[in-house]
């Protein structure tokens, strides 16, 4: 029994060992099969790669070139975007902002124009009627009403104003002119040269100056008021002027009788003319020399035959003014009720002298009054062109302060230096 059990156990153990050995062999076979399959797969993949390399030998170079090309294209696109941004967002378009015509086209968007409604109405009125004179008058009236409204000035109810400050400025100007005229006898030399170079008739000898008095008083302006001129449709300043002074000019000449032979007789003549009083109402206004009203007024004056003799003498200056491009001018005239008083002294003859002949005095006075009326008395007026008031570098001035030489003083045994400059005060407390 025991032997049989031993044999059975031995058989069982051998079977189990056989099963284990069989299982291990099976596992080893599976592992070997898997390794073989893996090797076959690797060999298959290697063969495929070798075939691909053989069929496409330049594939790597193509991939490398496509990357470089993409990089270059990307850089170019970035540069193009930067250029477009700088051109359209940083810098302005020159063609859209710089006007082709340097005239009014470039200033239309810069200058602020007010009263657009009035301008539109004026333009519509011009298209309907085409009357430039009416357009100018309407525009001038609108400007005048705007000026009076913004300056709070009522031409009908505003009180007259004194011109004390203006009198001081005029007095300073006249005083400076007198000083310059009397400096080195400038006025004498100027008048003497004028009389010497003047064309005289054959019966008048050389004219010599005997007396010159430019006065020492000043005109007084007062009672200034602004009025609306009905004739020229503009604002005018009415100013009362009063001058009580003595302005004298004395000359001496000879009347020559050249018949029947030259210098048959000689008659000495001495004249002294003095203006002792002038008063009147002065009308002053600022105008544009290209105004239509002014041109029409000049044409009317010429048609009326005003000052034919004087017009020929003044034609050169008138032509010069007509050739100008216009500008601001000061227009002034005096009312017909002015007051002008003269004192005329005459002395005729060599031995038997005739003194203060009334006929000669009235003749000279009438000639002077006629000369004044034809130039300055309404409806005639004088136009004085004003210089440009725009600030310029060439007109800029600056006071120059010059230092005087240094002077030394001794006080209580100590020396002190003092430097003085014009317009400064020297400190005396050393």
Curated annotation (Swiss-Prot):
Topology Lumenal: residue spans: 1-70
Domain SMP-LTD: 159-387
Pfam families associated with the record: MMM1
Keywords, ordered alphabetically: Endoplasmic reticulum, Lipid transport, Lipid-binding, Membrane, Transmembrane, Transmembrane helix, Transport
Example GO molecular function: lipid binding
Membrane topology: Single-pass type I membrane protein
UniProt subunit comment: Homodimer. Component of the ER-mitochondria encounter structure (ERMES) or MDM complex, composed of MMM1, MDM10, MDM12 and MDM34. A MMM1 homodimer associates with one molecule of MDM12 on each side in a pairwise head-to-tail manner, and the SMP-LTD domains of MMM1 and MDM12 generate a continuous hydrophobic tunnel for phospholipid trafficking.
Domain notes: The SMP-LTD domain is a barrel-like domain that can bind various types of glycerophospholipids in its interior and mediate their transfer between two adjacent bilayers.
Role this protein plays: Component of the ERMES/MDM complex, which serves as a molecular tether to connect the endoplasmic reticulum (ER) and mitochondria. Components of this complex are involved in the control of mitochondrial shape and protein biogenesis, and function in nonvesicular lipid trafficking between the ER and mitochondria. The MDM12-MMM1 subcomplex functions in the major beta-barrel assembly pathway that is responsible for biogenesis of all outer membrane beta-barrel proteins, and acts in a late step after the SAM complex.
PANTHER family, alphabetized: SMP-LTD DOMAIN-CONTAINING PROTEIN, TEX2 PROTEIN-RELATED
Protein's recorded name: Maintenance of mitochondrial morphology protein 1
The encoding gene: MMM1
